[in-house]
Amino acid sequence: MRRHLRASLWILCLATMAFSILAAVNTSPKPTLTSAFSGKAGTTAVKANKTTGELLPMVINTWNFTAANVLAWRILKQSKGGLRQTRNAVVEGCSKCEKLQCDRTVGYGGSPDELGETTLDAMVMDGATMDVGAVAGLRRIKDAIKVARHVLEHTQHTMLVGDAASAFANAMGFESESLVTPESKDMWLQWTAENCQPNFWKNVHPDPKVSCGPYKPRPTPLTRWKEDRARNEYEIGRKNHDTIGMIAIDVESNIHAGTSTNGARHKIPGRVGDSPIPGAGAYADNEVGAAVATGDGDVMMRFLPSLLAVETMRAGKPPAEAAQEGLRRILKHHKDFMGALIAVDRLGNYGAACYGLAEFPFMVSSPAGADGPTRLETVKCIGGQDKVNIVAL
């Protein structure tokens, strides 16, 4: 009897010790692991003990538009953690690029259309409310991104276009002025002197490859339409087809995204690209993250790559894979296009992907910078210098 009692007490003692050990393991602190994307396609650097507070707040934008990023970061830091400043940061950052005429592809005095006029497209999206304000084909108003903000804050609409958008801007206190500069006028005169080459016309006469318009539709058998879809006649590049896309996130993962551009050089009057289109030029959702795009807007807007990138992150993929996915859908149909995509999740992890260039530069400001908050990063492009196999989706 005593032997059985002694054995029972020994078993009870062992069980108590085991329970104590398990409790200690389960309650001990664990290191946090967060992936910080290095900017190289398909690679990540996993850094231990990274917390949201160290990655956020954040400002990230397309291309090496440093001054725009620095200003946006300064504005974001006006409040602790960037709270209530993400909209101001995006609007003022993009506005800085408009004033500086970044690459002559943002703001006034760049990318004249067939009539020699510069028109502007811009958008602001709020990731908390999913509200959007945008303008397209804006004429005679320099502050495109600020007019887009007024559409967001003072109307129930998403987008205003053309002369009506300009009239709205006037009513909101913006002054009308010419967007043509001596440089943009010379650019247009040289283009017309070279028989309006290149241009965006097809299936018209006279032959748009050798002559200016006016053009008339050319009767074309249906078997010829696919042949004439080729876009190789007009070389798309960053100097004639560019956008600033910017994302700002505060420490509570409140997100704004914005874009601004003067569109494609020598475009047909009335053309609107991807920049002011929600889901194409930019998309933001506080629950997931945001994405911004740049490149051949006529192609990219058909596939809503920014929306696709955000939804890919929603499905659990990291930002770098989400950015690549946004481009793969396009490459299934268009192997001759140029474009880039930046994706950021709500915690501040980010990635980028590009196609048709050697590499794509972008600006990042966040507390995670080793040599200061603001840095230039690059990503090597698929289809830039080396041939790659495109996975059909």
UniProtKB/Swiss-Prot annotation:
Disulfide bonds: 97-102, 196-212, 354-381
Chain positions recorded as substrate binding sites: 271-274, 294-297
Keyword Methyltransferase: no
GO CC annotation terms, alphabetical: cytoplasm; lysosome
One matching Pfam family: Asparaginase_2
Residues making up the signal peptide according to the UniProt record: 1-23
The protein's Enzyme Commission number: 3.5.1.26
PTM summary: Cleaved into an alpha and beta chain by autocatalysis; this activates the enzyme. The N-terminal residue of the beta subunit is responsible for the nucleophile hydrolase activity.
Name of the protein: Putative N(4)-(beta-N-acetylglucosaminyl)-L-asparaginase CG1827
